[in-house]
């Protein structure tokens, strides 16, 4: 048995705070750190000193890019709980960083969704919400900025219902709004809470509910109790008998339904004005899961069978690396979530994805950007290790005697690329090192060298993503670089099936070369990827040459069919062929496979695919006509229009190629008042006139 822990596992919460860019997520996190006693002076984003945003660019741009993990402790607003440990993973809200969000959601157990009381549910909130649904993450909602002009709590609650298809259950109501926002009503305790402004909200007083709010409170309290009662027959019977439930029963019922993802308890406040954050921390403890409340993580055992690891110190050690960060003081930091077992500093771990054993140097518990060295980590913990060389994002690290590979994360393919070159000879070598490190940290960022032009090409999820990479090269690695024009990552595919022979024979004195194959090349569903099948019977092509044929096909796919872009979504089957006892070789069959694919694919109705982006524009009504006209000129397909407090929302699908420089154009169209978000949606066939122009340009 493992030795007793300082804080039992059921008193640990691994949470993320997710939100749209300006909903006030970083300020909320800051206040959490302040009230839990970690942070002695509150950081403000608009002064550029927030604790969580520790990369320089984040402080300049005021947006959060890297998900730092922070540990803090909470005893409750009235010191009513035993000590709980809360690990907070900061998630970015900008759409170019969806990969960061995916990563953090993968290792959290619960989340707090922060909404702006004025902007409500923004397009970005919808994206993150969908991602959280995919990982079945239980959530609380916090309607922030209740002190802002235009604040409206119930409107946001309705948007959570209508736009996010969630079931919001307010457990608080605001007292007043805008500059009259004074405090909140706790619907469970039936009390008003007023935070004391003199000590920055550290103390508060409980008071009776204001007369003019009693009817409203009664209405929402009943909805909340009904939601709690629906958690079990037992509670429902008690409610029907007594017409009420005790505070403990309400919390128990709400917790059960939150963990089952049936409801989202909603709270409100103003983080900036120090109102409501401690009550939010209490709700994290009351309603969000501990590692023991979530299902055991699944994975693949060493023998290929399905296995799992439950959150216990007594199980074999298994953890998932979810973030790699370069740190100026200690080198590479690997952030990981422990799912089972115990790891001590100095232990060796096994990485089944890379097939490598590594020794853990130091273990650090992170407080945003300061660090505390610890001796061990246990199931449910989140920590950072120093000194791991081969581990990349999404890898498993585990006990060597009990190998398991935890489910890998899926990372999106990059959709945009730019050529980049160092400004001076001295920068040349440093640039290679810098790009390598950045690619190790961020799986949605790729680097390769273009064979023809010998240029270094970097690829990513959007213009902002690549701008920040170039910016980090300059700051962290002192590399100055010139950046080319952004280029779109087109793809090619085929529309019909074909059978094609590829025969490679060279007989010129001495040993010749002989490879002969017949391939069937067929289109697959969009997004289905590449499949290679061996249907050879009777050994007409010996088995040892089959991998060479596949290799030849794959290499030719990288070179494209008509325009030199990678081919996707095809199935290739080798079904016939012949060989020569002496002259056949892997090389010959690789060339034969490559020839057959090149020849066959070019006759199979090849088409060019272009990335289509899902774009949402929010614009004041008076610019609506210009904005829509401009989107139509960009080959946009309008999918729908909606109203929001910030103006009209236009939902549109636009080819990425037409979106370069859109930020600047939109600013001038709307005098800086319209905003947009953009994320990759799918690849679709480019119209023939566009495709022809691109092919011509390529050749």
Curated annotation (Swiss-Prot):
An annotated GO BP: ribosome disassembly
PROSITE patterns associated with the record: G_TR_1, G_TR_2
Pfam families: EFG_C (PF00679), EFG_III (PF14492), EFG_IV (PF03764), GTP_EFTU (PF00009), GTP_EFTU_D2 (PF03144)
InterPro entries: EFG_II (IPR041095), EFG_III (IPR009022), EFG_III/V (IPR035647), EFG_IV (IPR047872), EFG_V (IPR035649), EFG_V-like (IPR000640), EFTu-like_2 (IPR004161), G_TR_CS (IPR031157)
Domain of life according to the entry: Bacteria
Keyword Cytoplasm annotated: yes
Annotated Gene Ontology cellular component terms: cytoplasm
Keywords noted in UniProt: Cytoplasm, Elongation factor, GTP-binding, Nucleotide-binding, Protein biosynthesis
GO molecular function: GTP binding; GTPase activity; guanosine tetraphosphate binding; translation elongation factor activity
Localization, UniProt: Cytoplasm
Residues holding GTP: 19-26, 90-94, 144-147
Main location: cytoplasm
Functional summary from the UniProt entry: Catalyzes the GTP-dependent ribosomal translocation step during translation elongation. During this step, the ribosome changes from the pre-translocational (PRE) to the post-translocational (POST) state as the newly formed A-site-bound peptidyl-tRNA and P-site-bound deacylated tRNA move to the P and E sites, respectively. Catalyzes the coordinated movement of the two tRNA molecules, the mRNA and conformational changes in the ribosome.
Family of this protein: Belongs to the TRAFAC class translation factor GTPase superfamily. Classic translation factor GTPase family. EF-G/EF-2 subfamily.
PANTHER family the UniProt entry points to: RIBOSOME-RELEASING FACTOR 2, MITOCHONDRIAL, TRANSLATION ELONGATION FACTOR G-RELATED
UniProt-recorded name of the protein: Elongation factor G
Organism per entry: Coxiella burnetii (strain CbuK_Q154) (Coxiella burnetii (strain Q154))
Encoding gene per record: fusA
């Amino acid at each position: 048995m493992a030795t007793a822990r300082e804080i039992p596992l059921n008193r640990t919460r691994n949470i993320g705070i997710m939100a749209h860019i300006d909903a006030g997520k970083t300020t909320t996190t800051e206040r959490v750190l302040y009230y839990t006693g970690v942070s002695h002076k509150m950081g403000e984003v608009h002064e550029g000193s927030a604790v969580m945003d520790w990369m320089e660019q984040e402080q300049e741009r005021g947006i959060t890019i890297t998900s730092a993990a922070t540990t803090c402790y909470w005893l409750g607003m009235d010191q009513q709980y035993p000590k709980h440990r809360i690990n907070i993973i900061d998630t970015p809200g900008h759409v170019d960083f969806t990969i960061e969000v995916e990563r953090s959601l993968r290792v959290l157990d619960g989340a707090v969704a922060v909404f702006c009381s004025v902007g409500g549910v923004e397009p970005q909130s919808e994206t993150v919400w969908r991602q959280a649904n995919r990982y079945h993450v239980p959530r609380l909602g916090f309607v922030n900025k209740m002190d802002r002009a235009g604040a409206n709590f119930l409107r946001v609650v309705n948007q959570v219902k209508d736009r996010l298809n969630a079931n919001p259950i307010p457990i608080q109501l605001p007292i007043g709004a805008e500059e009259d926002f004074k405090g909140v009503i706790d619907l469970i305790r039936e009390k008003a809470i007023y935070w004391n402004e003199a000590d920055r909200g550290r103390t508060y007083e409980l008071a009776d509910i204001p007369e003019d709010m009693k009817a409203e409170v009664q209405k929402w309290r009943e909805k909340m109790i009904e939601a709690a009662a629906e958690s079990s027959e037992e509670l429902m019977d008690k409610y029907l008998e007594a017409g009420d439930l005790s505070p403990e029963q309400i919390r128990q019922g709400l917790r059960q339904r939150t963990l089952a993802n049936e409801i989202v308890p909603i709270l409100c406040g103003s983080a900036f004005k120090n109102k409501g954050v401690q009550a939010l921390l209490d709700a994290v403890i009351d309603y969000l899961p501990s590692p023991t409340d979530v299902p055991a993580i699944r994975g693949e055992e060493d023998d290929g069978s399905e296995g799992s690891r439950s959150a216990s110190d007594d199980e074999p050690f298994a953890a998932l690396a979810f973030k790699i960060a370069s740190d100026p003081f200690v080198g590479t930091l690997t952030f990981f979530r422990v799912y089972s077992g115990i790891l001590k500093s100095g232990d060796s771990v096994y990485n089944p994805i890379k097939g490598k054993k590594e020794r853990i140097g130091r273990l650090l518990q992170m407080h945003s950007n300061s660090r505390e060295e610890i001796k061990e980590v246990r199931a449910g913990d989140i920590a950072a290790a120093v000194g791991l060389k081969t581990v990349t994002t999404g890898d498993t690290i585990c006990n060597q005697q009990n190998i398991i590979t935890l489910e890998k994360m899926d990372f999106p393919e990059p959709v945009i690329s730019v050529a980049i070159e160092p400004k001076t000879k001295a920068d040349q070598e440093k640039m290679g090192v810098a790009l390598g490190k950045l690619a190790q940290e961020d799986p949605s960022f790729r680097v390769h060298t273009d064979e023809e032009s010998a240029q270094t090409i970097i690829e990513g999820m959007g213009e902002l993503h690549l701008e920040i990479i170039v910016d980090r090269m300059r700051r962290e690695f002192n590399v100055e670089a010139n950046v080319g024009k952004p280029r779109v990552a087109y793809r090619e595919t085929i529309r019909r099936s074909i059978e094609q022979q590829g025969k490679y024979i060279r007989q010129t004195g001495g040993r010749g070369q002989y490879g002969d194959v017949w391939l069937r090349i067929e289109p697959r569903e969009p997004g289905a990827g590449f499949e290679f099948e061996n249907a050879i019977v009777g050994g007409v092509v010996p088995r040892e040459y089959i991998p060479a044929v596949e290799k030849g096909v794959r290499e030719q796919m990288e070179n494209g069919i008509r325009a030199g872009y990678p081919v996707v979504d095809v199935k290739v089957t080798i079904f016939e062929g012949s060989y020569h006892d002496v002259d056949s070789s892997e090389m010959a069959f690789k060339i034969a496979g490559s020839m057959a694919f090149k020849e066959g694919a070019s006759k199979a109705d090849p088409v060019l695919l272009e990335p289509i982006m899902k774009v949402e524009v929010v614009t004041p009504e008076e610019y609506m006509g210009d904005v829509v006209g401009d989107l139509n000129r960009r080959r946009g397909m309008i999918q729908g229009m909606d109203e929001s407090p910030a103006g009209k929302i236009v939902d549109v699908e636009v080819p990425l190629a037409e979106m370069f420089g859109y930020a600047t154009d939109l600013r001038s169209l709307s005098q800086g008042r319209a905003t947009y978000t953009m994320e990759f949606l799918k690849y679709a066939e480019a119209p023939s006139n566009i495709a022809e122009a691109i092919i011509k340009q390529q050749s």
